[in-house]
Amino acid sequence: MIRLQIVERPEANLFKVLKRAMRSGELRTFSLEKAGSRVVHVRSPGYMKWEDTGGVLACEIRTPREEGKEWQLLTNFIGRVVDRFPTLVQGINIQVDAPPPEPPRKRRKRAARR
């Protein structure tokens, strides 16, 4: 899972602008699901849950079917936002959750010889 925070410039309304662009077809490779609370990409696996928290877009990227592929949606989304809306973005913060460690292997006990 990757967490992403996009800090918008004052009075930018980046969340509304992005939702409008996705719904109108200006951003053709992205679409909204679940009443606009989830973003999906045409080719990248997974989805991004997002919400507006007063000047900061809080996003969480997940790929439940293909673990470790979050980076594809991340690069597509950041690239598109920075390319199309550079005047609305002030900063981007990315936080990566490390995968849980693998459990140690259990050793089998040998059968006793008789």
Residues of each region from the PLM?
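Short secondary-structure junctions
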Residues: 25-32, 43-44, 85-89
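Negatively charged, low-complexity tracts enriched in Asp/Glu with abundant Ser/Thr
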Residues: 1-36
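Short, solvent-exposed polar/charged micro-motifs at secondary-structure junctions
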Residues: 15-16, 39-43, 101-107
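Short, highly charged C-terminal tails/helix-capping segments
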Residues: 89-114
